[in-house]
């Protein structure tokens, strides 16, 4: 397995796990907000505001994972070192 294949697998698995985690987190946040509004409709404004801030923070995880995956794929600072190490191991 060469270096670029490993980078593709790492980026793919990283993005999948990050998307799964943020999806679960956002689902639980919205579920709790809907339950809160159904119990106390008068507080829907505060609940909605808090939920939106929470969703933005949860979504930032997916953005960070995307940035790390793009760095792994296109701007990997250890590319030359890893390629030399893999060539040495292959010999």
UniProtKB/Swiss-Prot annotation:
Record keyword Transmembrane present: yes
GO molecular function, a single term: proton-transporting ATP synthase activity, rotational mechanism
Membrane topology: Multi-pass membrane protein
Gene Ontology cellular component terms for the protein in this record: plasma membrane; proton-transporting ATP synthase complex; proton-transporting two-sector ATPase complex, proton-transporting domain
Keyword ATP-binding set for record: no
Alphabetized UniProt keyword annotations: ATP synthesis, Cell inner membrane, Cell membrane, CF(0), Hydrogen ion transport, Ion transport, Lipid-binding, Membrane, Transmembrane, Transmembrane helix, Transport
Superkingdom, taxonomy of origin: Bacteria
Site feature Reversibly protonated during proton transport, where: 59
Transmembrane feature ranges: 4-24, 53-73
Compartment list: Cell inner membrane
UniProt function note: F(1)F(0) ATP synthase produces ATP from ADP in the presence of a proton or sodium gradient. F-type ATPases consist of two structural domains, F(1) containing the extramembraneous catalytic core and F(0) containing the membrane proton channel, linked together by a central stalk and a peripheral stalk. During catalysis, ATP synthesis in the catalytic domain of F(1) is coupled via a rotary mechanism of the central stalk subunits to proton translocation.
NCBIfam families: ATP_synt_c
Protein family per UniProt: Belongs to the ATPase C chain family.
Binding partners and assembly: F-type ATPases have 2 components, F(1) - the catalytic core - and F(0) - the membrane proton channel. F(1) has five subunits: alpha(3), beta(3), gamma(1), delta(1), epsilon(1). F(0) has three main subunits: a(1), b(2) and c(10-14). The alpha and beta chains form an alternating ring which encloses part of the gamma chain. F(1) is attached to F(0) by a central stalk formed by the gamma and epsilon chains, while a peripheral stalk is formed by the delta and b chains.
Protein name: ATP synthase subunit c
Organism: Trichlorobacter lovleyi (strain ATCC BAA-1151 / DSM 17278 / SZ) (Geobacter lovleyi)
